[in-house]
Regions:
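Polytopic endomembrane small-metabolite transporters, centered on the Drug/Metabolite Transporter
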Residues: 1-311
C-alpha cells in the first residue's frame, strides 16, 4: 500500500475515533436520549450487518461450533465495555471522561505482565503514572462529582483491560483474522445486549422520546451508529497497514482534541483551575508515553553492539 493510502487510512481512523465520542455525547447529553443500552445495541448491530454484507467471504464458517467457546469471554467483556463507555460518555464531561479512561492503561500493563509476560521500560511506566496522577487531580477538582458516572468509568476501565488482553490472546492462540474476530465478537454480543435492553429499557419512554423526528438528532444518531462500524473497521485497517505505535500516536492526538475540544461540547464541563491542571498533566503523561514508547521501539531495532554503546 502506498504512503498516501496509509496516511488516508490513519486519518480516517482518527476522524471516526473522534466523531463517535462527540456524536455519542450529543445524542445522550444534548438531546438526552433515554437509553444508552439501546444505542450500544444498535451500534453493535450495525457493525455485524456491515461485516456480514461486505466481508462475509473473508470469514471461515466451517468450524463455527467451536467459536462460542473461544470468543464468548471476549464478547462479555466487549458488551460491558461498549455499554459502560457510552454510559460514561453521557454521565461525565468529555475532558474528565478522557482523563479517567487513561487509568485503564495501568490495568492493561499489569494484565500484560501477569498474563502475557510483557515488560516495558521504566520511563514508560513513569509516563503512565503521570497520566494517572493527572486524572486523579482532575477528579479532585471536579465540582460536578457524579458517583454513578465515576462507577461507569471504573467498570469501563476494567472491561477495557479484559477486552484488550482477551483480544490479544484470541488473535495469538486461535488464529482468527481481525475481521473474523470483530464479526464473531459482534455476533455473540448481540444476544447479551438484546437481553440487557429487554430487561432494563423503558420502551414507553423510548417510543415517546421527543426528538425522534428532529432531523438534527437523527443525523447525530445515525452518524453515531455508522461511526461505530467505521471505527471498528478502520482500526483493523490502521493496525494492519501501519503499526501499533502509529495507532498509539493517533490515539494520543485524538485524546488531546477530545480533552480540550470536549470542554465546548455537551455543555456539562465546569472549569476549575485544579481540574484543568489535572487534565493537562494527564495529557502531558500521554504524550510522554508515546515519546518513550517510540524510543523503546527504536532501541529494539538497533544492532546489539549499538545498544551497548547507548546509555
Amino acid at each position: 500500500m502506498s504512503i498516501r493510502k496509509i496516511a488516508l487510512v490513519a486519518l480516517i481512523y482518527m476522524s471516526f475515533s473522534i466523531s463517535i465520542i462527540f456524536s455519542n455525547k450529543l445524542v445522550l447529553t444534548t438531546f438526552k436520549f433515554p437509553s444508552y443500552l439501546l444505542l450500544a445495541l444498535i451500534q453493535t448491530l450495525f457493525t455485524f450487518i456491515l461485516i456480514q454484507t461486505l466481508c462475509s467471504y473473508r470469514i471461515r464458517s466451517d468450524d463455527f461450533t467451536e467459536v462460542p467457546i473461544k470468543i464468548l469471554p471476549l464478547s462479555i467483556f466487549s458488551a460491558v465495555d461498549i455499554v459502560m463507555g457510552i454510559a460514561g460518555t453521557g454521565s461525565l464531561s468529555l475532558p474528565l471522561f478522557t482523563a479517567l479512561r487513561r487509568i485503564s492503561n495501568v490495568l492493561i500493563m499489569v494484565g500484560e505482565y501477569l498474563l502475557l509476560g510483557t515488560k516495558r521500560s521504566i520511563p514508560i511506566y513513569l509516563s503512565v503514572i503521570v497520566m494517572v496522577i493527572g486524572a486523579v487531580i482532575a477528579a479532585i477538582g471536579d465540582i460536578t462529582f457524579d458517583p454513578i458516572g465515576y462507577t461507569y468509568i471504573l467498570i469501563n476501565n476494567i472491561s477495557t483491560t479484559g477486552k484488550a488482553l482477551l483480544t490479544k490472546s484470541r488473535l495469538r492462540d486461535y488464529d482468527f483474522s481481525s475481521i473474523e474476530l470483530i464479526y464473531f465478537n459482534s455476533l455473540l454480543m448481540l444476544p447479551i445486549l438484546f437481553i440487557l435492553v429487554y430487561v432494563q429499557c423503558d420502551f414507553t419512554e423510548i417510543i415517546q422520546f421527543e426528538h425522534w423526528f428532529d432531523p438534527l438528532f437523527l443525523l447525530y444518531f445515525i452518524f453515531s451508529c455508522c461511526s461505530a462500524v467505521a471505527l471498528n473497521y478502520t482500526l483493523v485497517q490502521c493496525t494492519q497497514y501501519t503499526s501499533a505505535l502509529t495507532t498509539s500516536i493517533l490515539g494520543v492526538i485524538k485524546n488531546i482534541l477530545v480533552t480540550y475540544g470536549g470542554m465546548f461540547v455537551g455543555g456539562d464541563y465546569v472549569y476549575t483551575s485544579l481540574n484543568f491542571a489535572g487534565l493537562t498533566i494527564s495529557t502531558i503523561g500521554a504524550v510522554l508515553y508515546v515519546v518513550y514508547n517510540y524510543k523503546s521501539t527504536q532501541y529494539k531495532c538497533l544492532p546489539t553492539k549499538s545498544r551497548t554503546l547507548i546509555g
